[in-house]
Amino acid sequence: MAVMLIARFDGDVDQLRRAYDRAHALIMSRGGATGAGELRHHCAVGEGALYIIGVWESEERVRTRWASEEFQDVLTSAGFPSPKTADITILELYAAEPPL
C-alpha cells in the first residue's frame, strides 16, 4: 500500500536549502531513490523548516531507506541534517492526482 512521507527538518531555511540542493544532486547522480521505492518527491519550505514530502510504495520501504546508514551518510556528507533529526510522519495514501 502506498504511503506519504512528511519529514520536517527544523533550522535556518537558507542553510537547509543549500544543503538540500547538494544532497539531492548527489542522490540523483547515484540514480535517485526510485529503486528504494520512492514514487514521487517534493521539497517545500516554511517558517524555520524544510519539508521533504514523498510518496513511497510502502511504509516498510520508506522506513528501510530512511534508517539506512548509507542514506544518512549521503545526507550528512552534503551538510544536510541526519534523517534521525527529522520529525517524521508516515500516512496511508488515500488518493493522488494525477493517479500513480
Where are these regions (language model features)?
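Low-complexity, intrinsically disordered Gly/Pro/Thr-rich segments
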Residues: 72-78
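Short S/T/G/P-rich N-terminal loop/turn motif that feeds into the first structured element of a domain
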Residues: 1-51, 55-69, 81-100
